[in-house]
């Protein structure tokens, strides 16, 4: 027996989300069916608002409603340091720590030869232009994940940035291999930032 078309389309839509297979998508679709009209309307409005109201900061690449984002606009932050992360949600993890007060740059991915992702496919060019335009930046802290692709990206960044005389450091390896920054607790992140090593 096939599901009615609206349910089948909703299942297909949920399956486009990362980590959601057919069983989970079916469960979510039927849960949605049982929600009140008001809750479904609010859910739909939230989805539309994310696409309509959010965009990438023209300076750092973080998700924001304003341009530049609140972090880039905050002149009380340490303007001499830029912490480079893979995704916007990594910034949220670092900010929860409340110990890093510098700036950020979001790559929106990593260099991954196995996935066919090269330097031109990530937000790298804007980082290089930013470093060239803002001579007050003295240190780039590379906070890509401790995976093969994260390490490849970190080495590539160091290779590009060090010749400009900017200090390049890497988070200490208190992070386990393959660990995602956004799933790491604040104490471990704090130790990783404090114990960063020069590349």
Curated annotation (Swiss-Prot):
Q: Does the keyword Transcription regulation apply?
A: no
Can the keyword DNA repair be found in this entry's annotation?
yes
Per its UniProt entry, which superkingdom is the organism in?
A: Bacteria
GO molecular function ontology, one term from the record: DNA binding
UniProt zinc finger (C4-type) residues: 57-72
Q: Boundaries of each Toprim domain copy?
A: 80-176
Annotated GO biological processes are: DNA recombination; DNA repair
Q: Which UniProt keywords apply?
A: DNA damage, DNA recombination, DNA repair, Metal-binding, Zinc, Zinc-finger
Similarity comment text for this entry: Belongs to the RecR family.
The job of this chain, per UniProt, is described as:
May play a role in DNA repair. It seems to be involved in an RecBC-independent recombinational process of DNA repair. It may act with RecF and RecO.
What name goes with this protein? Recombination protein RecR
Q: Which organism is it from?
A: Limosilactobacillus fermentum (strain NBRC 3956 / LMG 18251) (Lactobacillus fermentum)
Gene that encodes the chain: recR
